[in-house]
Regions:
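Protein kinase glycine-rich loop
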Residues: 16-22, 27
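AlphaC helix of the eukaryotic protein kinase fold
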Residues: 45-67
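A short, aromatic-enriched beta-strand patch in the conserved N-lobe beta-sheet
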Residues: 78-79
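Conserved short submotifs of the Hanks-type protein kinase catalytic core
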Residues: 82-96, 100
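Activation segment signature within eukaryotic-like protein kinase domains
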Residues: 114-115
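Protein kinase catalytic-loop region centered on the HRD/HxD motif
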Residues: 120-130
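Activation segment of protein kinases
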Residues: 145-188
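C-terminal lobe helix-coil module of Hanks-type protein kinase domains
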Residues: 175-277
Length: 321
C-alpha cells in the first residue's frame, strides 16, 4: 500500500493532516465525505500491514472500540467497506495527558478531578468485561474542560484472556512505569491492574515523579515488588493526608487490598472528607525502608540478566533457522 498524504481520498475519507505517528501507525485527521464529519483515522505503516500480530492487534482494538459506548471512551466507528486496514475514530479536540504532565505538576483538585473521570470510564469498560492493560498518560486524552477519553485498546483483553508469557511479553505486558505487581509476576491481571496504573498516574500528576524507578525496565518493575513509594506528602506537603491515603490504596502491592472497583476509587476522590487515613508504619520513613538487601541485590542481578538471556535465545533460534 502506498503512503498517505494530505488531500488523498481513502475510500470515502478525505485525508487532511497528520496528527501523530508511532512505530506502527499514523493517525490522520480526515473528513467523512458521506456526512461531512471530522474523524481520526489510524493507519498502520505500509511495511507493517502484512504483520499478522499487528493485524490481530488492530482487529482487537477495532472490535473492542466498536462495542463500547461511553463519553469517556474514544468511539470507534463501524465501517465494513474498506479497501485496506485502518480504523476510523471520533475526532477529539484535546491533548494527551502526557503533554499536560510535561508542563508541570497538577493541583490536587485537578489531579483528583481528572483521575475520577478516568476511573468512571474504567468502571464502564470493566463492567463490560474489558481490561485496558496499558493504562498510561499516552493513552488518555484530555480536552480544555478536563473531560477525558481513553484511547488505544490494542493490548486490551476480555476477562479470562491469556496470561503473560515470554512468548507474548511485548504484546501483553504493558508499560514498565505503570504495570501492576501481579503482571510483573506473570499473572493475567484484571480491572485492579488498571486501577494500579491509575494510582501511579495520580502520584505522578501530584509529585511530578513516578513512584518506582530503575535504570532499565526490569529494575523499574522489580522496584515495585520490593519497595514502598516515597510518601507524596514528603515531596509536596500541600497534598492532603486523605489524598495520599487514596494513592496508597490504589498502589497496594496485593490486588486484594486495592480498590475493588474503579467506581470505589472515583468515589473516594470525589468525597475525600470521608476517607479514613490508615496508620502505615512502612511509609513513615522513606530513607529507612525495611528491605532484605541480599535478596534485593539477587533480584536486581537476575532481572538485569533477563534481556541478555532473551537476546541469546533469539540469536540461537535465528542461527538454527
Amino acid at each position: 500500500m502506498t503512503a498517505l498524504h494530505p488531500g488523498d481520498l481513502l475510500d470515502h475519507y478525505r485525508i487532511e493532516k497528520l496528527v501523530a505517528r508511532s512505530g506502527m501507525a499514523s493517525i490522520w485527521r480526515a473528513t467523512d465525505t458521506l456526512n461531512d464529519r471530522t474523524v481520526a483515522i489510524k493507519v498502520p505503516h505500509p511495511e507493517m500491514e502484512a504483520d499478522p500480530n499487528l493485524f490481530e492487534r488492530f482487529k482487537r482494538e477495532r472490535e473492542i472500540g466498536e462495542k463500547l459506548d461511553h463519553p469517556g471512551v474514544m468511539k470507534v466507528y463501524k465501517d465494513d467497506h474498506r479497501s485496506r486496514v485502518y480504523m476510523v475514530m471520533e475526532w477529539v479536540d484535546g491533548v494527551l495527558l502526557r503533554t499536560l504532565m510535561a508542563q508541570g505538576k497538577f493541583s490536587p483538585e485537578r489531579a483528583a478531578r481528572i483521575t475520577a473521570r478516568v476511573c468512571e470510564a474504567l468502571d464502564y469498560i470493566h463492567s463490560n468485561g474489558v481490561v485496558h492493560r496499558d493504562m498510561k498518560p499516552e493513552n488518555i486524552m484530555v480536552d480544555p474542560e478536563d473531560r477525558i477519553k481513553l484511547i488505544d485498546f490494542g493490548i486490551a483483553g476480555n476477562e479470562g484472556s491469556r496470561r503473560l508469557t515470554f512468548a507474548n511479553l511485548s504484546n501483553v505486558m504493558g508499560t514498565p512505569d505503570y504495570i501492576s505487581p501481579e503482571q510483573v509476576k506473570g499473572k493475567r491481571g484484571d480491572g485492579r491492574s488498571d486501577i494500579y496504573a491509575m494510582g501511579v498516574m495520580l502520584y505522578e500528576m501530584l509529585t511530578g515523579k513516578v513512584p518506582f524507578t530503575g535504570n532499565n525496565p526490569f529494575l523499574i518493575m522489580n522496584d515495585r515488588l520490593l519497595n514502598s513509594p516515597k510518601p507524596p506528602r514528603e515531596i509536596d506537603p500541600s497534598i492532603s493526608p486523605a489524598l495520599q491515603e487514596i494513592i496508597y490504596r490504589a498502589l497496594e502491592r496485593d490486588p486484594k487490598n486495592r480498590y475493588a472497583s474503579a467506581r470505589e476509587f472515583a468515589k473516594d476522590l470525589e468525597h475525600q472528607d470521608q476517607v479514613g487515613v490508615a496508620d502505615r508504619p512502612e511509609m513513615h520513613d522513606w530513607t529507612a525502608r525495611k528491605s532484605h538487601w541480599p535478596k534485593r541485590i539477587l533480584n536486581y542481578v537476575l532481572l538485569a540478566l533477563v534481556p541478555v538471556v532473551i537476546f541469546t535465545l533469539l540469536l540461537w533460534v535465528a542461527r538454527k533457522t
